[in-house]
A protein has these predicted regions:
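Short, surface-exposed acidic
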Residues: 33-39, 72, 122, 166-169
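Metal-dependent phosphoesterase signature
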Residues: 56-89
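Active-site neighborhood of HAD-like aspartate-dependent phosphohydrolases
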Residues: 1-50
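C-terminal cap/substrate-recognition subdomain and adjoining C-terminal extension
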Residues: 1, 5, 82-206
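A residue-level signal for conserved active-site and pocket-lining positions in enzyme catalytic cores
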Residues: 12, 74, 125
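Electropositive phosphate-/nucleotide-binding environments in soluble metabolic enzymes
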Residues: 17, 52, 68, 148-152
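Short, compositionally biased "basic patch" segments
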Residues: 43-67, 123, 129-130
């Protein structure tokens, strides 16, 4: 079925800033003695930058707070830290598109472990996946980082499962980043978010 979609990135699109960094800062503030864990984070990111280790290991090290946080704590983080960071004009745009009958997807490199607590009126949340053990989300990544072409792949998988087809001319995509050009090219209407204030303008792609 031909469907009007609105695809939204999350970091610096729906919220200002990097949600993964906010998670780490939030956890360290509550558990300052865990600061030594940052050495492991730096170590794995250095190996990643040197192309010795894959991104998965570095990102999993960064997400170590998930191993220690309960679902209630993760939800509290979303409500107390991420929700106040919303660009209100972009949130209103999302709600407007939903009211107009658009199918709304959030597609982000941020992890589903906390994105699942988003209460916005969206139809799908597609984020980087992490392992679940004994019913609890962990820091260990599963599959690829949901970025660049991976976003297109994830969107296409869900659309196919629902027997839907993107109405190219009438669909929208919102992002702050050139990394999202593959997703932006899935639709005709491409909106750039200014990271300073959330101002929306046409995303010009050559």
């Amino acid at each position: 079925m031909l469907t009007r979609f609105a695809f939204f990135d999350f970091d610096d699109t729906l919220i200002h800033g990097d949600s993964g960094g906010k998670l780490l800062k939030y956890y360290l503030k509550k558990h300052p003695l865990s600061v030594f864990k940052l050495l492991k984070v730096v170590y794995h990111y250095a190996l990643y930058l040197l192309k010795i280790e894959p991104l998965n290991k570095a990102k999993s090290a960064w997400l170590y707070p998930l191993d220690k946080m309960s679902d209630q704590e993760i939800e509290k983080f979303y409500q107390e830290v991420l929700e106040p960071c919303y660009y209100l004009n972009v949130i209103e745009e999302l709600k407007k598109k939903k009211a107009e009958g658009y199918t709304i997807y959030i597609c982000s490199a941020s992890v589903e472990a906390y994105l699942r607590f988003c209460k916005l009126p969206v139809d799908e949340i597609l984020g980087t996946k992490t392992d679940i053990k004994d019913g609890k989300y962990t820091s260990q990544m599963i599959g690829k980082n949901c970025k660049n072409e991976e976003k297109v792949k994830r969107i296409q998988e869900v659309i196919k499962n629902h027997n839907l087809e993107i109405d190219y001319d009438l669909s929208y995509a919102y992002s702050d980043s050139l990394h999202d050009i593959p997703m932006l090219k899935m639709v005709k209407n491409r909106i750039k978010i200014d990271t300073k204030d959330g101002h929306m303008s046409s995303f010009e792609i050559e």
